[in-house]
Regions:
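Transmembrane alpha-helices and adjacent helix-loop boundaries
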Residues: 1-335
Length: 335
């Protein structure tokens, strides 16, 4: 019962925060009913997806202080599991998605055990290495389409197909990912108040002290890493049905892993709202830059340069990101 109360308990936030959150939530619910372009709808779906990626990264990277730069490998496992099972055996999304999550979590336990013997930059580099190795394996593995990837053909089905997540109108995809988005917020709100959440924050503050208090540091990290993996893999499965054309080069790229981490850091790692704020800033910017400065102006990669500049500027002002700046302004007003 206490765990259930923690899910819906936002009392540690100021009332003004909850008012703003309520207004944003209302806007997200009614957005498809307002006049909008297909570009705006696609951007909003990307925002919700990357918010969830960021929430997952934030559990291990924000609350645990472990900089993971290999999250795209789990996105790929979820995406390719769903695509392979749908194309080869006509398995519905609601069956293939949990299987993809289970496979991704299993892989996270396999590599997490040795990875979390490493610390600091060594851990970050190791996560990059494991992700790139898995991407290379997928690029030569014919069963998952190798480098050419896989394509889910909507022609085979009669949309709207809620079992396989095949739709002609993006509004269906929007409300499904919005549901996952709200559930993700509730889960992270529970996690940060859970025993594991407190253990992670203790480990982040001082690993030796946490160990002296009886916390199994290694196991706490591995469990949290699995939770972060489940978030990313779940959205990866959705990604396969939404995009319909997936390739290892795009789905499991290092750029994608870095972007996921940057969003949480920009918004405020270790805070509930940080990944959402980060996605709210970077995803519209990403969509605009790729549409107008990338493809049309021929400035390939300009988006990554601008992300780096933004992160450096924010970090120079407040290392805890945009949420840290908001809290700093509040403290000054109280003083």
């Amino acid at each position: 019962m206490e765990a259930l109360r923690n899910v819906f308990d936002f009392s540690d936030f100021p009332r003004i925060d909850l008012v703003v959150v309520g207004m944003v939530a209302l806007f997200l619910v009614v957005f498809p009913l307002l006049p909008h372009s297909s570009f705006a709808m696609a951007t909003m779906i990307q925002f919700l997806m990357f918010s969830l990626y960021g929430m997952g990264w934030n559990t291990i990277g924000g609350y645990g202080g472990q900089v993971d730069l290999g999250k795209a490998q789990y996105l790929g496992i979820g995406a390719f599991t769903t695509a392979v099972m749908l194309i080869r055996w006509d398995v519905p999304f609601w069956v293939s998605m949990p299987i993809g999550v289970a496979l991704a979590v299993t892989w996270s336990f396999i590599i997490g055990y040795p990875l979390f013997r490493l610390t600091g930059h060594y851990f970050a580099i190791a996560t990059i290495a494991t992700s790139l190795v898995l991407k290379d394996i997928f690029e030569v593995w014919d069963f998952v389409g190798a480098a050419r990837g896989l394509e889910i053909s909507p022609i085979k089905y009669s949309p709207p197909d809620f079992l396989r997540l095949i739709f002609k109108e993006d509004i269906y995809y929007y409300y499904i990912i919005l549901g996952f988005f709200f559930l993700g917020i509730l889960y992270v709100n529970w996690f940060r108040k859970s025993r594991l959440g407190f253990q992670l924050r203790s480990i982040k503050d001082n690993e030796d002290v946490a160990q002296s208090l009886g916390i199994n540091v290694h196991w706490a990290k591995i469990k949290t890493y699995a939770i972060a993996t489940a978030f990313v893999s779940l959205v990866g499965s959705f990604h396969a049905c939404y995009i319909k054309n997936i390739e290892p080069e795009d789905t499991m790229s290092l750029d994608l892993s870095i972007l996921i981490a940057l969003m949480a850091m920009l918004g405020g790692a270790g805070s509930l709202w940080g990944p959402i704020i980060g996605a709210g800033v970077l995803i519209p910017l990403k969509s605009y830059l790729k549409e107008w400065l990338g493809a049309k102006a021929g400035l390939v990669g300009i988006d990554l340069i601008i992300y780096a500049v933004i992160i450096m500027l924010i970090s120079a002002v407040e290392p805890r990101g945009i949420w840290g700046i908001i809290e700093k302004i509040r403290r000054r007003k109280r003083a």
